Amino acid sequence: LWVTLDNGIAQIHVNSPIYFYEPLEAQIGMVHDMVIEKGIVYLATNQGLYALSENDSYPTLIPGTQEQTWYISDVGNQLIAGHNTGTLQLEGRKATQIPGPNGGGTALRKTIIHGKEVLLQMSYRPLSVFTRDMVTNRWKFSHNVEGFSNLIKSFEVDPTGNIWASHMYKGIYRLRLNEDLRSVQEMEYIGKLEEGNELSLI
């Protein structure tokens, strides 16, 4: 569809699958992550964790989640969010803190290392391990990994079990954990690549 305007011509893609959302009232800040679960859109932002459903005019803040929320992740039977105050579990529009690590969860990955299925969470400082409770089938905090404490924004785990962690401001770390996942067995800091190559965020 072509439209003639006072200052030119505009093309409108009528059947485009892309929608643009412009909030009318809520100032939700910068969006870091998003998940859609049971008809609710969850937005992890630097102002808190917001929810938006079909019947809502604009996103609303989930109570108790003010401040920085780095990620929200669907790990099968749980929605988990990394928040300034700790690791949150979401049910509908209710957030409760998972006992264990304190504050600053920046990224979460479900992975298998040394034959163990775990959740790994990076944060402002420690690397945390979550294991599945065999009774409730829910993820729970297990322990912090010894030997690594850094400000990590994102990470990935490769098929051989190497953890590649991107620092908030400088370089990348390659980590290997010991068999019981309780300490770092190997650590390599990669500050720069060979001349002509550039580092990028993981």
Kindly label every feature range from the protein language model.
Residues L1-I202:
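Carboxylate-rich, polar loop motifs that coordinate divalent cations or form catalytic acidic clusters
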